[in-house]
């Protein structure tokens, strides 16, 4: 992280909001427990790809960052009401969401996934007929599963506030599978041989930071993200948290337009 912040400090950046605004913290809401994006270490410190990214943006804008733990489904109301300035938590940009919130440019491309017990009867989407599956409330996994439940023959969708309770139910066989973002699940199961990510579901998702609709601060953050991409900070974060160099044409590297 020190190397990353050194790269940020080397950038020639600005503070369009003035000296008084520069002293105010940027309040960032995050669904802590959403590995590897934002989670708490044993000592209680918040870490993760998006925690590092939020702090890098704050460094670039010359403002401290305050992280607030909010369940995923509560992030939308929190940012709309002004309780927080930015929401992060592997939030997918969608046309539906753009009707009520704003986004900066994307910085990660993703897909959905099916996670199951490694030795269980369910090992594919085809095995979900008559089964109970879990999703995170209000997530794109929830949306995808709801749209496809009838075609897949899913008997019941159970909705959770965060990954931990869903994984407890999966391990105890109260649900037969869990549908969620693939990077989080691949990271989560890496040291859990009794669980397996068995399906990658292509959805063309892109993650970004979320703002209140029409908030001009989104333009400042968007430009900071552009500079961080140009400086290689986003690519370094990707390599740090995912163990791989992002593709040159990926949303992690390429400067992109804000979605409108």
List each language-model region with its residue ranges:
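Bacterial N-terminal signal peptides
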Residues: 6-16
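Extracytoplasmic small-molecule ligand-binding "clamshell" domains
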Residues: 23-90, 99, 221, 240
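Bilobed "Venus flytrap"/periplasmic-binding protein-like clamshell domains
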Residues: 27, 32-35, 44-59, 92, ...
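Periplasmic-binding protein-like
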Residues: 31-32, 108-116, 182, 186-226, ...
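Short helix-initiation/N-cap motifs at beta->coil->alpha
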Residues: 51, 66-77, 157-169, 205
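Extended ligand-binding regions for polar small-molecule ligands
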Residues: 51-60, 122, 126-132, 137-140, ...
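Ligand-binding clefts/hinges and TM-proximal coupling segments of bilobed small-molecule sensing domains
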Residues: 64, 140-158, 197-198, 229-260
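A ligand-binding cleft/hinge motif common to bilobed small-molecule-binding domains
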Residues: 74-77, 89-99, 146-147, 169-203
């Amino acid at each position: 992280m020190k190397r990353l912040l050194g790269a940020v400090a080397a950038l020639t950046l600005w503070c369009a909001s003035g000296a008084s605004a520069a002293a105010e913290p940027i309040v960032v809401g995050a669904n802590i427990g959403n590995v590897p994006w934002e989670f708490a270490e044993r000592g209680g410190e918040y870490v993760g790809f998006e925690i590092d990214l939020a702090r890098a943006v704050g460094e670039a804008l010359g403002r401290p960052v305050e992280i607030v733990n909010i369940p995923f489904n509560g992030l939308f109301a929190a940012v709309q009401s002004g309780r927080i300035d930015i929401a992060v938590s592997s939030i997918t940009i969608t046309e539906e969401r753009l009707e009520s919130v704003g986004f900066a440019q994307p910085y990660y491309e993703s897909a959905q996934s099916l996670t199951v017990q490694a030795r269980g009867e369910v090992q594919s989407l085809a095995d979900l007929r008559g089964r109970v599956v879990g999703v995170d409330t209000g997530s794109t996994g929830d949306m995808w599963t709801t749209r496809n439940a009838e075609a897949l023959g899913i008997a019941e969708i159970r909705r959770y506030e965060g990954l931990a309770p869903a994984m407890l139910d999966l391990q105890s066989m109260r649900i037969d599978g869990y549908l969620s973002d693939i990077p989080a699940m691949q990271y989560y199961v890496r040291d859990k041989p009794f669980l397996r990510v068995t399906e990658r579901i292509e959805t063309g998702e892109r993650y970004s930071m979320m703002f209140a609709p029409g908030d001009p601060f989104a333009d400042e953050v968007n430009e900071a993200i552009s500079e961080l991409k140009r400086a290689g900070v986003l690519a370094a974060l990707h390599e740090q948290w995912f163990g791989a160099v992002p593709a040159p044409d990926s949303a992690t590297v390429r400067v992109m337009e804000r979605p409108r």
